[in-house]
Amino acid sequence: MKTGIQLYALIALLGAMTLQGAEDGKPSYDKSLIEGRRIARMLLGQRPTENAAVARSIEVRPRSGEARTIPFQSRVVVDGDGEWRAIYETESAGAAPAMRLTIRHTRNVAADFFVQERVREGGYGELRKLSWKEVFQPFAGSDFRIIDLAYPHSDHLTWPTQRLLDKDIRRGQSCYELESVNPNPGQGGFARVISWIDIDTGGPLEITGYDSNDGKLLQFSPKRFRKIDGEFKVTELHISNRETRSRSVLRFDFRKSENEAAESRQSALDAKADAEAE
């Protein structure tokens, strides 16, 4: 199944090989680490090729109490030279204020996070860069953390230890089982992450984060897909929080976005026609 993610392979084996002592005193190369680093570099090389806008919503299903839905808009702006921005605009949800979150992806792999609170209808306050600690906070009161929205630059693929555990079948697709190990698990986040990556497309089929005791913390998995322009795109992404026993569902409304895009194109054509008529 194609997930519509275009890959740009940035594979560099130099420096990716890990030496281990062998019985004969000669170094041996751990192929699983070499392949793991190669796959991580490939994923980090993914880039959007054009601007896009998608209407979304997050449904939060707590362990107790009623479920709630948080609508928001998102768009991708390609800035060129391998850099782009993902922008999320939310409505207020409980204690979480309406805000605009901007994630800036650079050629240096690491993402920067900026937030603006809405001060009036359609207006936003001062742009503030989030600290490393702040990006692990929930997004709009959901089980998604802010840093999770930066995938593939959501930090675990940049850790030095990347190991290919196996090639497996997941959801009927051939996939890599990739283990990412956090060198500093005490600084927040996961101790390790297991990702199942579609071999054909590079799209994630499942991602599970573990704590230092190897207990599951969060599990991400796409559940529904829709064929758009000949490619399958994720329309529903689930995340399970094992600590709070809650679940959040991220939904993508491509039909609404397509209608808005069509209306925008028609408005532009109408404006051009009016200008020519004058």
Predicted regions and their residues:
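Gly/Pro-enriched, hydrophobic low-complexity segments
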Residues: A93, T102, I147-Y151, K167-S267
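N-terminal mature ectodomain segment of secretory-pathway/periplasmic proteins
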Residues: K31-G123
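Boundary at the C-terminal end of the N-terminal hydrophobic targeting segment
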Residues: L19-E23
